[in-house]
Amino acid sequence: SKDYINESHGTFIASTIQYGNKLNGIIAANSKYKFVDIVAIPNGDKNWGPTDGIGEEELMEIIEEVMEKYSSSTKIWNMSLGIESKVCDGSMSDLGIFLDYIQDKYCVQFFVSSGNLNQLPLREWPPQDDMGERDRIISPADSVRAITVGSVALYEAKDSIVRSNEPSPFSRRGPGANYIVKPDVVDYGG
């Protein structure tokens, strides 16, 4: 139902792809992109209206259906989600394995978030000893074939816990399963 749609983050990512050069003051070719807006997950943030959810199996079924319909014309996919209850612990998540399968089968590329750390204390840099593993990447950021994107701080203030160009305090870190380097890339965020 349209009542359960949160359009904030995906819209932001799409506009950054289309207009990122202009937003960052970079002169570049006037490229145009075609966007396919697939709302697979209901809104989970009560600040955006009614909330609902789906299970991982249902999400995988939706992704497979979408690939069957659009993968011949749309090759790059953004997946702005992370399953906080599934921190990378050295083994691959079911969703990470599934995304690898989908990318091979349909010759597509997924970009996924490394995930955000949403509970205090946030991580300093270098990480404090008591952080443990709770700031590790979350599913599906452990996909081997997906390009996992993390965040680095652009600015710093007198009371910042990280400096400019250090990993953002909320951005999750690798490694992935079998010590695979994750995130693959970082950009300024937060």
Give the predicted meaning of each segment:
Residues 129-190:
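Extracellular S/T/G-rich loop segment that most often corresponds to the catalytic His/Ser-adjacent loop
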Residues 1-55, 107, 142-145, 155, ...:
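Subtilisin-like serine protease catalytic core
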